């Protein structure tokens, strides 16, 4: 079982798949055992409940769904899961190491 679980949510759960791969690579290079996955924003309630996937230790929203931050933040707070929106620059440039660092900062 992974030490930490990092969930990403975007419009369809597809556009973040490359970013997830880059984050997994960065984690492995640093000896971190993280489970990192992406799903659609429609799955946020299930993710926060740990239904169908492990409950995340942190939830990151893709910048294209940043408008949902207020609503998701309330749900995440109730679930005890820190969350934030991925920086547009890091998302656009697929900087897995930077997004991983942001997730780690939220978990600490």
Swiss-Prot record:
InterPro entries according to UniProt: PTS_EIIB-like_sf (IPR036095), PTS_EIIB_2/3 (IPR003501), PTS_EIIB_3 (IPR013012), PTS_sugar-specific_EIIB (IPR051819)
GO molecular function per UniProt: kinase activity; protein-N(PI)-phosphohistidine-sugar phosphotransferase activity
Catalytic center residues: 10
Superkingdom of the organism of origin: Bacteria
Keywords of this entry: Kinase, Phosphoprotein, Phosphotransferase system, Sugar transport, Transferase, Transport
Keyword Repeat assigned: no
Phosphocysteine found at: 10
One GO term (biological process): phosphoenolpyruvate-dependent sugar phosphotransferase system
Protein's recorded name: PTS system galactose-specific EIIB component
Organism per entry: Lactococcus lactis subsp. cremoris (strain MG1363)
